[in-house]
Amino acid sequence: VRLTLDGDWTATTTDEPLRSTPRFDFPGQCVRIAEYADVEGWQRFLGETFGSQEWLWDAPDELRFDRAGRELVGAGFRLPYECAAAEDSARVPVTPAVRPGGLRADEARDFRLDVATELCRAPGDTELTCLRDVDVLDEPLEACIGIASDVALLVQHGTVVGWSLTDPVRYLTTGFAAPDPASPSPAVRSLFSECLDLVTQPLLDQVRGRDPAALARLRAADETLRAQREDRRRADALLSLIGNLVED
């Protein structure tokens, strides 16, 4: 299947998804899928590959391809700050089923992959679906390409219109660190939903506006995270951002 990612920039699907474990950097509000483990490794990776990447003040999503075989070798997606209305999130299609696969660029040149603007949250935040805009929900999806474990590109009319992350709590981390391989605790799953409320619109505006009720929720989340004993690495990932908001 041939996909359009930016104007006349196209790629063809393959049967080889990425083998790297996704990393949901909660303080950075982004999902990374690649082998690098620090900033220096990331910069080397960008120099050795082509595709979509940050440049100066422009920060699109990342899809990176190797120069030899033009195969997809890494990805990075930014989480939108704007939560879709509940009625829109309820319209996120459950079909078609995710088909594991990769991408091969049709030519070796850079392009720009726009970030998603709408965050659709499934009940219990079991899945996060990030869309170009809510108009995508007016028509069915053509394909869901599972480019990595629990990460899929969403395709409509031959164009990538968004991405999804299933079981996001499992992949929580900070920076470039690998996520905890153990299963998430029920307590941290619940705290994740509360924290995601606090760092996305509309509640984020209330926090920044110093609304008393919103600040009370923020401080309660901060205290609960600090007291959390099990699943400490994921709790610390959440606390990295929540603690900063409290200090601000």
Spans of features found by a protein language model:
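N-terminal intrinsically disordered, cationic/polar leader segments
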Residues: 134-142, 151
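Short, small/polar residue-rich loop motifs at catalytic or cofactor-binding pockets
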Residues: 59, 144-149
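A short acidic/small-residue loop/turn micro-motif
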Residues: 80-81, 168-170
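Generic structural signal for well-ordered beta-strand positions
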Residues: 73, 161-162
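Intrinsic disorder/low-complexity detector
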Residues: 1-50, 54-56, 61-65, 75-131, ...
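Short, surface-exposed charged micro-motifs
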Residues: 62-64, 150-154
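C-terminal effector modules of nucleic-acid-centric enzymes and ribosome-associated factors
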Residues: 143, 167-168, 174
